[in-house]
From Swiss-Prot:
Single Gene Ontology BP annotation: iron-sulfur cluster assembly
Protein name: Iron-sulfur cluster carrier protein
Homology family: In the N-terminal section; belongs to the MIP18 family. In the C-terminal section; belongs to the Mrp/NBP35 ATP-binding proteins family.
Coiled-coil stretches noted in the UniProt entry, renumbered to this chain: none
Domain of life: Bacteria
Oligomer and partners: Homodimer.
Pfam family of the protein (one): ParA
Keyword Ribosomal protein on entry: no
Length: 383
């Protein structure tokens, strides 16, 4: 082998090593591990031509993938111009990829319901609509993701879905054979029935269809290794709440209420479902907890004491401490942030609302799933 050939081989090896550090923005795995590198060609002078496979031709992240590949190669000493060409996986390659990601199981399983799952699952519930449950969900999820954790949001409010709008996303999921790849928005994986409907078309489904949709979102969607999954439930204790308890029995309930005592009574019923489903209540969040005035005082527009009342009554009902995790002030900026699709924890984190949401998120993200029933891979017979 000539010195030129040897140099080219060394450079190709270095480029391959660099590509192993390029993470696919949707699958969150190295592109080399996913079989996405088609070819690496080294030309005289250090010019590099690399071919990359996309899962589908209309991949919404193809520009991002191309940029990441180009940058990774350009940082390799000895490389000159970089040319990236994109191709599309064959059906056989997609099947191989799906098996690598999900295994060869004929029936997809719900990963979060498995005994060895370390994902913390929070179901955000409320007794009635209009208390800001979805607003709390998107802000807590985004705040936790900003802390570096892998987070997913499942919009389980099939009839009243609003998560895509509040996250500022109109992306559609990618279908990879029988597997669904959710869009990633603000570093959060998001799935909603609203991503599959046209315009503002209503979803007119009854119980069995709702259960099946939820089951598919949990099993057919490739969530990857999540630290936290948040489900935005519809108000009340209907079909979806029951299905969640059946499909993910380890899910913990986060109750959202307003300070109004009448609303608190309804929220208490939403939390009391834990008595029947044997789920754990992680805590209560009081939203719209007074309007901050210019002089620093707080105007109690919707009364006061509702959140504390729910926490105390649920504590007595379940026999364990149910804390009041936080009280989020009433702020028009929070509404505007939801309409704009940029959660307030991202664009106004120093505001009273932003600070309180971040404080609640810190409490939830610092809690680890209990290891009861989880195999640690230890064999006491081995020394």
């Amino acid at each position: 082998m000539s010195r030129t050939d040897r140099n080219a081989a060394d450079l190709k090896s270095a480029v391959s090593t660099a590509l192993a550090k390029v993470i696919d923005p949707e699958l969150q795995r190295p592109i080399t591990e996913l079989g996405m590198v088609k070819n690496i060609d080294i030309e005289p002078g250090g010019n590099v031509q690399v071919g990359i496979y996309l899962t589908i031709a209309s991949c919404p992240k193809k520009s991002e993938i191309s940029k990441r590949v180009t940058k990774a190669i350009a940082d390799v000493p000895g490389t000159a111009a970089v040319e990236v060409s994109l191709d599309v996986m064959s059906d056989e390659q997609r099947t191989k990829l799906r098996k690598k990601l999900r295994g060869d199981a004929r029936e997809p399983m719900i990963p979060f319901a498995q005994p060895n799952s370390l994902t913390r699952v929070y179901t955000v519930a409320s007794g009635k609509g209009g208390v800001g449950k979805s607003t709390v969900t998107v802000n807590l999820a985004t705040a936790i993701a900003a802390r570096g954790l892998a987070v997913g949001v499942l919009d389980a409010d099939i009839h009243g879905h609003s998560i895509p709008r509040m996250m500022g996303s109109n992306q559609r999921p990618i279908q990879l054979e029988s597997m669904i790849l959710p869009p990633i928005v603000h570093e959060v994986k998001v799935i909603s029935i609203g991503q599959f409907t046209e315009g503002n078309t209503p979803v007119i489904w009854r119980g069995p269809m709702l259960h099946r949709a939820l089951q598919q979102f949990l099993s057919d969607v490739y969530w990857g290794d999540l630290d936290v999954l948040m489900l935005d439930l519809p108000p009340g204790t209907g079909d979806i709440a029951i299905s969640v308890a059946q499909l993910i029995p380890n899910a913990e309930i986060l109750v959202v209420t307003t300070p109004q005592l009448a609303a608190a009574e309804v929220a208490e019923r939403a939390g009391s479902i834990a008595l029947q489903t044997r789920q754990r209540i992680v805590g209560v969040v009081e939203n719209m907890s007074g309007l901050m005035m210019p002089d620093g005082s707080r105007l109690q527009v919707f009364g006061e004491g509702g959140g504390q009342q729910v926490a105390e009554r649920l504590s007595r009902a379940v026999g364990t401490d149910v804390p009041l995790l936080g009280q989020i002030p009433l702020d028009p900026a929070l509404v505007a942030a939801g309409d704009s699709g940029i959660p307030i924890v991202l664009n106004a984190s120093d505001s009273p609302v932003g600070k309180e949401l971040l404080r609640i998120a810190d409490g939830l993200s610092s809690r680890q799933r209990r290891l009861a029933g989880v195999s640690l891979g230890l064999d006491p017979s081995r020394r």
